[in-house]
Amino acid sequence: MNLNSVPAGEKLPNDIYAIIEIPTNSNPIKYEVDKKTGILFVNRFIPTSMFYPCNYGYINHTISLDGDPLDILVPTPYPVLHGSVIRCNPIGVLKMIDESGEDAKIIAMPHQKLLAGYNNNIKNIDDISNLMKSQISHFFEHYKDLEKKKWTKVISWEDVKSAEKEILSSFNRKKTLNI
């Protein structure tokens, strides 16, 4: 399986593909797809005992300000397997900083055609529950707590327009850097 050939989406910035590295409720293991080979590697075992609150992955052919592909979080009714590609629509962005600098995470819902009635009315970040936002914030504020010299801080939740801008900026950055 070569994930390098997966496009960023059908129609950027509002119809995108998420490549899932870590399913919802996964154990505290950080997986990352090696961008050169497309192979899923164990990045590290996270010492903080926490579960991922939603599917975690990235948007291919993007580079965020931290030098990695743009992160994406996809809440779904069930965990999505490692290495799966899921068509999504962005609904917002979680802005953070960590020991490496600015870190944005796109929040996206599965494309309407995939939902068969689940959550099909969620179009913007304010449409997801406060509980879901709190769970995501709590996870990302604390998952590095037991790792030396690592830290995170949630700055803000922003709307779908900010998410679309972040996606286009990251896509254009990748094209400009030609990497």
Swiss-Prot record:
GO MF assignments: inorganic diphosphate phosphatase activity; magnesium ion binding
List of residues binding Mg(2+) 1: D66, D71, D103
Protein name: Inorganic pyrophosphatase
PANTHER family: INORGANIC PYROPHOSPHATASE
Cofactor dependency: Mg(2+)
Pfam families from the UniProt entry: Pyrophosphatase
Catalysis: reaction(s): diphosphate + H2O = 2 phosphate + H(+)
